[in-house]
């Protein structure tokens, strides 16, 4: 999915200006009326976030559900991207990273969130969170080892290799 980079190479490489970054919020979008489907943006994106829609002949990408996040007809709790709203494990989060007091900013700070491939200089706005450390109580008990005797070809191979 698109990382909505601050320095988005997909925007600068687009020959028609169809790929653009909104000044008000930094969301990177594609104007499908101006897109010629050349694929330069897909080539330039180091994250593989672009794909060609062969039927329409234009490039497609994540829009951050811009139609949802600003839709005042929706209840406040529904104004988030569909991927965040429907993630079955709650692994995705959404919010204002420019506000250090926002829940998502606090989460990134507490968990040590980081940029994907920072050496590329694209400055992605999406952050990745490292896995949570699990305590012994959370991890659950270990299953007992089962003594399995290999049979057939695996048994023969075990016997042969056991000689060395």
What are these regions (language model features)?
Residues 1-164:
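Non-ligating segments of multi-cofactor redox enzymes
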């Amino acid at each position: 999915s698109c990382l909505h980079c601050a320095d988005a190479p997909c925007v600068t490489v687009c020959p028609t200006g169809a790929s653009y970054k909104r000044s008000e919020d930094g969301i990177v979008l594609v104007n499908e009326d101006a897109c010629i489907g050349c694929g330069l943006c897909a080539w330039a994106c180091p994250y593989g976030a672009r794909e060609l829609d062969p039927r329409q002949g234009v490039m497609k990408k994540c829009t951050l559900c811009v139609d949802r996040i600003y839709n005042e007809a929706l209840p406040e709790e529904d104004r988030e991207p569909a991927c965040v709203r429907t993630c079955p494990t709650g692994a995705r989060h959404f919010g204002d990273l420019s506000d250090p007091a926002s829940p998502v900013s606090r989460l990134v700070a507490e968990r040590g969130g980081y940029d994907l491939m920072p050496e590329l200089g694209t400055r992605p706005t999406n952050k990745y969170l490292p896995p949570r450390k699990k305590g012994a109580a959370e991890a659950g008990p270990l299953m007992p080892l089962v003594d399995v005797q290999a049979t057939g070809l695996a048994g023969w191979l075990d016997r042969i290799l056991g000689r060395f």
